[in-house]
Amino acid sequence: MRFYRSIKSMYNFGVNVFIILFIFSCSEKSKNNKEDFEILEGLRNQSLELSGKELSEMYCGACHLNPPPSLLDKNTWKTSVLPDMRRRMGLITEDDFGVAFGADADAPPGVYATQSYIKQKDWDLIEAYYLDQAPENLPAIPKDPDLDSDNSDLFKISVPENPNKRANLTTLLKWHKKEGLLYLGDRANRLFRFSGSDLKVLDSIKISSPPSDIRFRMGGGFDLLTMGVMDPSNYSLGKYSIFEAFSQEAFVVKKDSLTRPVHFAFADLNQDNEEDVILSNFGHHVGNFSWLENSPTGFQANLINNRPGARKSIVSDINNDGLSDLIVLMTQAKEGVYAYINQDNGKFKEENWLSFHPVFGSSDFDFVDVDADGYRDIVLVNGDNADLSPILKPYHGLRIFLNDGDYSFKESYFYPIHGATALLVEDFDQNGNPDVAVISYFPDTNNQPLQNFLFFRQMDKMTFKTFSFPELGNWSYLTMEKGDINGDGKMDIILGGFDFKTLYAKTPGNWVPFVVLENKIAIE
């Protein structure tokens, strides 16, 4: 018996070492779907007898962080997430009859395997493990007894009056400080300008598709990024254009065939004294994070990260070597915050600063010194719920990861918010401590009034007082911008309305594309 136990102990030790080495190799090597499948093929040829938990660590960990069963309820695992994962590994069963996947679901080759990379018996063990360990329901977010709805001393809500009958489908907001105008784009392929003084429409132009980002040029005109297709899609119809003036005739498309781009940034990445463009091509099953080299022959694409889900990037010289480095939020599968350290001449070294599980739902971030220690921290919201698991998740919310000075980040603040979508970090009360504004596009609809906007006022170092705004009613907000709208020296907030109900309404109501929160905080 002692000999048997020794042999079993040695076997278990070998299995554990194999799992550790395998997971490490996955995190180091897997850069795209092809490499994921190569890893899975190596797994399929193994004959180790593993438990469902051990198998999940290996198979699920091949493509992303291994999600524990506690992240989703039993029914969501059973009916949605697990079947899709099985199909991606090429294991097709009779349950898939009539289900669109692979090419039938607009997925290009390489997303869903064309051969099985997992044995049925191994899959059965993984499925049984998840369904046995998953809760029937996820825990609810407890009510915050300190949440304050008395916001009268903070912001005055202004709803612009607009007689136009148009759906509220705002995709872009940007305040032009010099012009004193608000630029607004919507899903109906139009770009508007609003007066900052009375919030009235001045003019508009037709554009090729829904806009996602804009940058005003020093000498006039602007750069514009359009998505091509706003809904989840692998079509490469997005465009980067330069407008010399606010006219639908005065523009040049500098780069087309972009895969659902949602954000751009600008910097000279290869030290040729030309401004290059950093693109977050969010995509769907496919996409990438890349940069366009501004060369004499046009803008040449250079790949940085070949995975979909790039949401937003920030340019910063992280190591103080005079070169522009990049920080990007990746929000699909291998979710996380990645830094790309410029190695000169446009080459980058990847650093994974933060990693999240694949149902985390990262949606927005900023890189700013929150605790006034001289080091820039990561402020992040997660709440994307337009996926395979559209249930209320108690781990959605606002997080602050403090920088220890060596770019090692520790979560130091968390406030749960269902469906947190976007954030603004700004010292709105000018007390020296940055505050945070958060919108939620996927709030708990059973919790009335909706918590679709929350304001976190930093009273002291990392001490926040949270305010709700019941007056904002049941509107849905997808975008947010800041700017001194009324010229009083204080930053105001603009919320961009996006509500499909207004698109399909039998009788269209008045157009309410945005709401202004006028800053009324007394400056001491």
For each predicted feature, which ranges?
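Beta-propeller-forming repeat regions
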Residues: 31-34, 40-53, 58-524
